[in-house]
Design a protein with these regions (language model features):
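Acidic, serine/threonine-rich low-complexity disordered tracts
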Residues: 22-117, 152-242
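Sec-dependent N-terminal signal peptides
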Residues: 4-16
Length: 242
């Protein structure tokens, strides 16, 4: 019994230091919250947030729970009300998507979904539909975090499969340039990432995105341009709690 207790204690200690070491290497951690000013079709509209909520267990594996929120303010609400909430659960080691819930409200448009990706069975379950898959999948919102774990080198390209609702699309991700960006949070030297596929867009029926990541240890998404249902959302970093 004493031996079993020692083994159990050792497992706990090793697990603790493993998670600690992993967290030390990452440019973000649980509790990080990035706040953005948001413009819709270049009109000041409201605010958006990216939050690392927790580390949960999904499909018997540890996963980062991250959340994207966007909302218009009182004036913009009268013109085109936006209340978008997307929760994604990303693999703790490689940041591909395990699970996602979406609750989208943009004007009169409404959309909700729950997606569970079962890699062991090579399927994705979206609401009540089952979709065959191959390899690792990334949802568009996971890219805000996945790219932060990589060396962002100008001219570098990467291929991956993007999962959005029931759509699976192969995309080439391109780090196009270095740019200096002025946002409410300050001035940042950034690497610019443009996911694309010729003739296709990153988000089905919505549009493309461009992300400016700070060229420092944190690689924060300083500026984001998203094509949403009926226009363009421009997000600029306002405050950050790392």
């Amino acid at each position: 019994m004493k031996l079993l207790n020692k083994i159990y204690s050792l497992i706990i200690i090793v697990g603790f230091f493993y998670h600690y070491a992993l967290a030390e290497k990452l440019p973000f951690s649980v509790g990080e919250r990035l706040e953005y000013s948001a413009k819709f079709n270049f009109i000041p509209a409201g605010k958006a947030f990216l939050t690392v909520v927790s580390i949960d267990t999904v499909n018997n594996l540890p996963a980062y729970h991250v959340r994207y929120e966007a909302q218009t303010g009182p004036i913009a609400d009268k013109i085109y009300k936006i209340r978008d909430n997307v929760d994604s659960w990303l693999d703790e080691k490689e940041f591909f998507t395990h699970q996602q819930t979406k609750n989208i409200r943009e004007g009169k448009y409404r959309f909700t979904s729950h997606s569970q990706i079962m890699y062991d069975h090579s399927i994705a379950i979206v609401n009540k539909d089952t979709i065959p898959i191959q390899g690792r999948l990334y949802d568009p919102y996971s890219l805000f975090y996945y790219f932060r774990t990589l060396d962002l080198i100008s001219g570098k390209t990467m291929d991956l499969t993007v999962f959005d609702n029931k759509s699976l699309t192969e995309f080439q991700m391109i780090i196009t340039s270095k740019e200096q960006v002025l946002v409410p949070a300050g001035t940042f030297d950034c690497m610019v990432v443009r996911p694309f596929r010729e003739g296709k867009t990153l988000q089905k029926n919505e549009g493309d995105m461009t992300i400016w990541f700070s060229n420092d240890a944190y690689k924060m998404p300083v500026q984001i341009i998203l094509k949403i249902k009926y226009g363009t959302m421009v997000m600029k970093l306002k405050t950050f709690n790392l």
